[in-house]
Amino acid sequence: MASTESLEALAAELATANDLELLQGAADLQRYSKDAYDYSPILQPQLASCRADLVVRPLSVAGVERLAAACGRHGVPLTLRGSGTGNYGQSVPLEGGVVMLSGALREVEHLDPSTGVVTVQPGCLMRDLDQHLRAHGRQLRLLP
């Protein structure tokens, strides 16, 4: 768990970046500190009290890099979150710190036509990826 001083210094540093959106309201902290773990009678009591101290939505890849570097400098845990649809606590901040929302980074960056290897940003929706692949005569055969 990060100290109050580290968290305050981190938040002050991140507030100056124009490619990061900071969410600090109680409702946001609660919402983004959970996934569907509450379906599990084992995980629910273990994870119910875990809360982020800060939620950050990077608006660019450079913002992700800036956020990760700042968390490292300040010794603040960083938990990555997609859509929060996991049900085993994957996106739960076990030791507080920052939860990073990846939803603003949704692009399909590259499709190699010879290998079929595709590079996407972390918030890319499966629907958007499937549409992109179909436009190139390919299809998503397995959901990662």
Residue ranges of model-derived segments:
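FAD-binding subdomain of flavoenzyme oxidoreductases
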Residues: E107-S114, T119-P144
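Gly/Ser/Thr-rich helix-start
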Residues: S83-Q90, C124, R138
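Residue-level detector of anion-binding/catalytic polar loops
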Residues: V76-P77, Q139
